[in-house]
């Protein structure tokens, strides 16, 4: 069974569950992506900063699947923001991936100190007009960044990929996304593993005969989030995709949501200006 599709504001759609390859060493990436595609995944999320675009692309090319069957996402790194730099960085990414178009291209971080994300997004829009990108979006954008971007370009991003897990459910940002028509995508959806042994999560999982990771992925799905769990273990990759045959109850959802404590595992987008 394939992942459900989430409709985007530009008429395209994205598989709700994908494989993320953040912090996946290049030597492990090809094997992980191959295992995911064999398990039924049709959505792979990488980034220039991950250093594994080449291996991601090679696994897709060797999978036997047509390019059109795999939803491919990568991200522009902070040091490459700006109109002309973005156009060059895009060409470098698709060259490493061995493809001629992207399904979704994201600005990795707003980098407020540089204040180049508007010009960067204008370059994204040009690439979309040229048929090189199907959908354009952002990552780690806070409400103030989204408002500036939309007011300046007249374009609403299709996706905002943000840190999101039960400890940091991002309610206000998700509500804003819903108002604006932006799809919410979760990175570190399992809380970088910190929630897998939590008794609340394991209790919900056991009541459905599922793993803690499966329960957390299902929690995201029922909130409407796109979710990209990361793993290099083929069995876990397969298990993380076995989430379409059960449903959490309202009580299950509330129990997992009650774990919120505003814990942020990654940098704060308001102050993260790293470009190295």
Swiss-Prot record:
Its EC number is 1.1.1.-. It is an enzyme of class 1 (oxidoreductase). SUPFAM superfamilies: NAD(P)-linked oxidoreductase. Keywords: NADP, Oxidoreductase. Pfam families: Aldo_ket_red. The active site is at 50 (proton donor). NADPH binds at residues 190, 228, 230-232, 236, 239-240. GO terms for molecular function: aldo-keto reductase (NADPH) activity. PANTHER family: 2,5-DIKETO-D-GLUCONIC ACID REDUCTASE, NADP-DEPENDENT OXIDOREDUCTASE DOMAIN-CONTAINING PROTEIN. Belongs to the aldo/keto reductase family. This is Aldo-keto reductase Mjls_1919. It comes from Mycobacterium sp. (strain JLS). The lineage of its organism: Bacteria, Bacillati, Actinomycetota, Actinomycetes, Mycobacteriales.
């Amino acid at each position: 069974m394939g992942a459900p599709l989430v409709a985007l504001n530009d008429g395209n759609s994205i598989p709700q569950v994908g494989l993320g390859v953040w912090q996946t060493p290049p030597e492990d990436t090809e094997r992980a992506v191959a295992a995911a595609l064999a398990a039924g995944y049709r959505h792979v999320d990488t980034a220039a900063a991950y250093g594994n675009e080449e291996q991601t692309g090679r696994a897709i090319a060797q999978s036997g699947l047509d390019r059109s069957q795999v939803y491919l996402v990568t991200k522009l790194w902070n040091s490459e923001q700006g109109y002309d730099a973005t156009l060059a960085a895009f060409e470098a990414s698709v060259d490493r991936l061995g493809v001629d178009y992207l399904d979704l291209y994201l600005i990795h971080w707003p980098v407020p100190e540089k204040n180049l994300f508007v010009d960067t997004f204008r370059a994204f829009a040009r690439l979309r007009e040229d048929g090189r990108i199907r959908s354009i979006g952002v990552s780690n954008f806070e409400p103030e960044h989204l408002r500036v971007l939309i007011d300046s370009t007249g374009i609403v991003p299709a996706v905002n990929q943000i840190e999101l897990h039960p400890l940091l459910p991002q309610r206000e940002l998700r509500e804003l996304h819903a108002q604006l028509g932006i799809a919410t995508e979760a990175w570190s959806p399992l809380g970088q593993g910190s929630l897998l042994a939590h008794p609340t999560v394991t209790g919900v999982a056991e009541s459905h005969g599922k793993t803690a990771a499966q329960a957390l992925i299902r929690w995201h799905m029922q909130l409407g989030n796109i979710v990209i769990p990361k793993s290099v273990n083929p069995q876990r990759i397969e298990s993380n995709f076995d989430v379409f045959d059960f449903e959490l109850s309202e009580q299950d959802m509330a129990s997992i949501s009650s774990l919120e404590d505003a814990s942020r595992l990654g940098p704060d987008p308001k102050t993260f200006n790293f470009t190295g």
